Structures are given as structure tokens and as C-alpha cells.
Amino acid sequence: MRLNNELVVFDLEATSNQADVGTRPALQTNNFIIEIGAAFLDRDLKLIDTFERLVRPEEPITPFITEITSITPAMCEGQPLWKDIGPEFEAWVSRHCQNVKRVRLAAWGNYFDIPLLRRAYAHYNLPFSFSGTCIDVKTMAMAWRALSGRRTDKLGVGTVASEMGIVPEGRYHRAL
């Protein structure tokens, strides 16, 4: 399989106003990024490079977020703000392709990651140069499961990875 453009698969971890570990928060995109992880894939889906940074948020990291991500306030304390990481991320993408506007972004659940990424750039008045198609990996996994006769409710990264024979390296709810 050969793509017509390069692919940047990325994930964000973010703050939340949810403090209680026992309940799940409502979906939010107005929080601050605390970690970005990305993999740059060429047109043949070959891994070219990875990018991972912790980000200092402008609001506290709650116990809920630490519980699900293992990211503590101390880990982000001395890290740069997104105003420094955003341009670094774009420069990293630019090193691997000729036209950043044509790069395809892909994330598990575009309804969260893409708006949060756009908001982070806008918050610091940074240009958002990524204008290509955004691929929702969760939607693709849901279609694959449905076409395979499997249930599509409670669809998580762990379930799909296991069904595809992918052994995770690291922890879920960490960006890379």
C-alpha cells in the first residue's frame, strides 16, 4: 500500500477539570496539552522518526490525569509551554517532507486531538500549517471491526491492538 502523502500519527495528553479519579470527565477540548507524541510515516507507511515532548500546562494537572497518564505535575514543571513546542513540532514535520500542508494527520479520535491541537496553536497565535486530511484511526478501526462481524461498542486502543496482534511498548494514555 502506498499513500499519496506522508502521514503523521499523533496523540495528545491534556489537562482536565476533572479531579475525581472515580468518574470520567465530559469530553473537553479547552484544556492544555501536557504531552505530544508523534510518528512520521513515509508514503509506504515506513516509520521515519518519532517526536515526544512533555509540555508545561497553564492549569494544574489533576489527580485524575495523573492516574490515567502517569504524568505528574513535577514532570511538566520545568518543561516549555506549547508556544515553544508547537513550532518545534512543525519544524520536526518539515524536516521529513517537502510540504507540511500536504501531510496527513492521524489520531485515535479526531474529535479530541485535532480541535485540541488547533486550539493550542491559536491560544499562542501560532500558525496552524497542517491543512491536509485528518484521518481518524478509531473510525477506521470501528469499520474494520464491523466488517469483521465484531462489536463496535466500548472500542479502545487496547482492544484493537490485541485483535491485530500488536504488542504495546509502554503505557496506554501516554502520547508515544
What are these regions (language model features)?
Residues 68-80:
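Short histidine-centered catalytic/ligand-binding loop motif
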Residues 7-11:
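Short, hydrophobic/glycine-enriched beta-strand segments
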Residues 1-3:
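A short acidic-Thr-Gly-centered motif at the start of a beta-strand
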Residues 12-24:
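Short acidic, Gly/Ser-rich segments with clustered Asp/Glu that frequently serve as metal-coordination loops
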Residues 5-6, 29-36, 40-71, 91-176:
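Metal-dependent phosphoesterase core characteristic of DEDDh/y 3'-5' exonuclease domains
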Residues 77-91:
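Glycine-rich, highly charged phosphate/nucleotide-binding loops
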